[in-house]
A protein has these predicted regions:
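Nucleic-acid endonuclease domains
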Residues: 1-80, 84, 94-98, 107-283
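Internal alpha-helical scaffold/solenoid segments in large eukaryotic proteins
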Residues: 87-88
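Conserved active-site neighborhood of enzyme catalytic/cofactor-binding cores
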Residues: 104
Length: 283
């Protein structure tokens, strides 16, 4: 019961922290405050709009704030030992080191043609450490050691590439004239299961996908909203492992509605989310 209270407390303060991140990260015109890289000769090189570069630089930009938040909240941060490890950060309670929270930093961009939607996130593996929860393969601590699994996310708009010249070098006195590669950054924090979809996040890899409606992400309205984390765990641990026969054909269960029906539950417990980038509810 004490751990449940600690988890609720951590969730509350992490959400509050996410609301403060706009200060210092975005300029008054809503552009990202980071303009580029500076060398020893005071030359500024603009940042590429490549999502991996933006994600890494934004992570570096946020890290001092994260350290301050952890220290002021009674936690210490343990970073992942390897790049492909889950999670990005482990928050360990200073009072009780057995209390740990996984926090993954997630960034994605709004779709220019459908600004109510984003490109989505991958929410970690549904194989390996997710299934074998007492083992330490590709994870900082065993999955079961964590009292909660959280996302600290950023959704941003890409700046029109016509206003950015990645080959140009600026002098420091021209800093204010540099157009940032991203703008309109919105930060949020939630538990991982709250924004999960029932579909994989990236091709053939065993990653959990997120919902893509920005409104639903910010509200935590994933497909498991009516069901909770236990159903999220159960579904994704069994994703693609169960075969059913429909109309004489066999197929694997890869939809939550089918999984609920297979288990003898009302398929309508799976929340309907906006999957279509053109809008409108789709299952």
């Amino acid at each position: 019961m004490k751990v449940v209270r600690e988890k609720a407390h951590f969730k509350r303060i992490l959400k509050g922290f996410a609301k403060t991140l706009d200060v210092g990260v975005s300029a008054t015109d809503r552009q990202w405050a980071v303009k580029g890289f500076i060398d020893a000769f005071r030359n500024i090189y603009t940042i590429s709009a490549d999502t991996k570069i933006v994600s890494k630089v934004l992570e570096i930009h946020l890290f001092p704030k994260l350290l301050e938040f952890a220290m002021n909240s009674g936690y210490r941060i343990v970073l992942a030992d390897h790049q492909n490890y889950y999670p990005d950060m482990t928050f360990v309670s200073a009072k009780n080191e057995s209390v740990k929270f996984a926090v993954d930093l997630k960034t994605t961009y709004c779709l220019p043609r459908f600004p109510a939607f984003c490109n989505g996130f991958t929410l970690g593996s549904h194989g390996g450490y997710f299934k074998e929860r007492d083992k330490k393969k590709n994870i900082q601590f065993p999955y079961n050691d964590y009292a909660g699994h959280f996302c600290l996310g950023a959704i941003y708009s890409r700046t029109d590439s016509g206003g950015i010249d990645e080959t140009r070098i600026f002098k420091i006195d021209k800093l204010k004239s540099i157009v940032s590669v991203i703008k309109d950054i919105r930060f949020f924090a939630c538990e991982k299961w709250e924004i999960a979809s029932d579909s994989q996040g990236s091709g053939n890899t065993a990653n959990i996908g997120s919902i893509v409606s920005i409104k639903d992400i910010l509200a935590g309205n994933g497909v498991f909203k009516k069901l909770g984390e236990r159903w999220f765990d159960d579904y994704w641990m069994n994703y693609g492992e169960i075969t059913i026969t429909q109309e004489g054909k066999q197929r694997k269960i890869t939809k939550l509605r089918d999984y609920l029906e297979f288990k003898g539950y009302d398929p309508n417990l799976a929340c309907t989310v906006n999957r279509s980038k053109k809008g409108g509810p789709h299952e």
